[in-house]
């Protein structure tokens, strides 16, 4: 290969269809330099090996592989988290769920709250909550061994003490009750055209099949046995599923049922409160 400079490599990446920022981040990681360095040193030469590795990364990105997989990490709610194949990439819209949870916890002073995160994936939700509320006792459940290993690694990386539990939804939490439960479960319906664009991420973390509501139904149905009276259940869902999820919560006798929108203004999270004095507590 002839001599290739930083500017040449970035121009070639754009011709491949790679976004300018994505290409800069990939090259900065490869060179172990900040992105600003690339801008100030666009005439710096690349070795043959660097050219080859950058071209390979750009080809993968152009084919739709998530940038987070190529970089090996993704920022979420102020925390840089390890991610990789087999683990769902944390989305900024899920921060809506975390912010809502923190509001509820702030409104309930007193003893350290008990919180559960069902289907934790990379640990994003659980770790963001623990980082913001070190006093909280947080339990995170995940059925994927690959994802759970990543979540544990992220916890160690940030020195955050979360109780990691292997299992499916409520199964590892028998006999436990919480003040707050959150979940970002698989909710994309089978056949949804968006799934094709997400083909590099684990299907089981994206879609439960059918109408996309089966895991949400299971979580709502089991929640009364695992929430303290007055406890809250918060759920992420598809932008067109808010009405259906609110109906599930109302059918399970939740009160104060409401929906919040994501960063783009789309209905993204719904939640409700278990009655302060439920029939089972009488």
Language model features with spans:
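Non-catalytic nucleic-acid substrate-recognition regions in nucleic-acid-modifying enzymes
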Residues: 1-20
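Conserved AdoMet
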Residues: 25-103
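Residue-level signal for inorganic ion chemistry
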Residues: 26, 64, 94, 125, ...
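Conserved beta-strand segments of alpha/beta enzyme cores
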Residues: 80, 137, 161-163, 255-258
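Conserved SAM/SAH cofactor-binding pocket of Class I
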Residues: 96-195
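Mobile active-site "lid"/loop adjacent to the S-adenosyl-L-methionine
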Residues: 186-215
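Conserved Class I SAM-dependent methyltransferase catalytic core
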Residues: 211-274
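Flexible, glycine-/basic-rich loop-and-beta segments that form/coincide
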Residues: 276-282
């Amino acid at each position: 290969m002839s001599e290739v400079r930083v500017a040449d490599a970035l121009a070639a990446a754009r011709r491949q269809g790679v976004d300018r920022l994505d290409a800069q981040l990939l090259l900065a990681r490869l060179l172990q330099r900040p992105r600003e360095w690339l801008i100030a040193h666009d005439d710096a030469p690349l070795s043959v090996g660097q050219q080859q590795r950058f071209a390979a990364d750009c080809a993968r990105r152009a084919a739709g592989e998530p940038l987070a997989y190529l970089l090996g990490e993704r920022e979420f709610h102020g925390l840089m988290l390890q991610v990789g194949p087999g683990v769902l990439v944390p989305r900024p819209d899920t921060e809506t769920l975390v912010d809502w949870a923190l509001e509820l916890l702030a409104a309930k002073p007193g003893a350290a709250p008990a919180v559960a995160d069902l289907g934790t994936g990379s640990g994003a939700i659980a770790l963001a909550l623990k980082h913001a509320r070190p006093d909280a006792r947080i339990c995170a459940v995940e059925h994927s061994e690959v994802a759970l290993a990543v979540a544990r690694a992220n916890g160690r990386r940030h020195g955050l003490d979360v109780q990691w539990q292997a299992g499916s939804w409520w199964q590892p939490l028998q006999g436990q009750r919480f003040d707050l439960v959150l979940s970002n479960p698989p909710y994309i319906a089978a056949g949804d055209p968006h799934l094709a664009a997400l083909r590099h991420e684990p299907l089981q973390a994206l879609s439960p099949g059918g109408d996309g509501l089966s895991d949400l139904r299971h979580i709502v149905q089991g929640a009364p046995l695992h929430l303290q009276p007055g406890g809250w259940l918060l759920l992420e869902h598809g932008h067109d599923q808010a009405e259906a999820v609110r109906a599930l919560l109302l059918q399970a006798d939740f009160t104060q049922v409401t929906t919040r929108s994501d960063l783009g203004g789309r209905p993204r999270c719904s939640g409700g409160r278990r009655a302060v004095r439920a029939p089972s507590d009488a």
